[in-house]
Amino acid sequence: MAFDDIYTAGIASGWKVTDASILQKNQTLEADVVIVGTGAGGGTTAEILSQAGLKVLMIEEGALKTSANFKDLDESRAYRELYQEGAGRASSDGAIAILQGRAVGGTTVVNWTASFRTPDHTLKHWADVHQVKGHSPEDMKPWFEKMEQRLNIAPWAMAPNPNNQVLNDACKKLGWEWHVIPRNVKGCWNSGYCGLGCPVNA
């Protein structure tokens, strides 16, 4: 079962979308708040502010794509159209590939849905080294729980494929601790195209 496309539903409910690539003349737009970037951070901020009654304008470098655009699952076109630098972005020394989304929704459109809590040692590091306050494991627990419920985050219940079963068996043999990575999906078809845009909005 495919789920309703949030962009199609949003536009139907009154979202106004302007594709600047086809504008023939300048436009003046008015808003209480302008947010640059429509990924997880920008999208969440826009939701909170709009629910508070503010008029929000979001600016996004990439195009607006819906699940209808992902039906053909054309890999070469997906990389070209949905990723920064055609999925060729990397750290300055070239050692780390940075698969960053370039579309309305940012990297939430093209990711592998891994969703885990910020580790306690990382929160402690932020507090000790960067003096970040109010983000201890105890402080963050209710927020993690809220988002896990909202985003349907849970370990994937499917049996491991043969590749992962080998890793599973090896970890057990070596006495290593292992866990299934929690994912933020609902109704996933296991098509394996998470990085190309989900055709069923899982």
Predicted regions and their residues:
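Conserved redox-cofactor binding core of oxidoreductases
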Residues: 1-14, 129, 133-202
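N-terminal glycine-rich phosphate/pyrophosphate-binding loop and immediately adjacent elements
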Residues: 3-126, 137-138
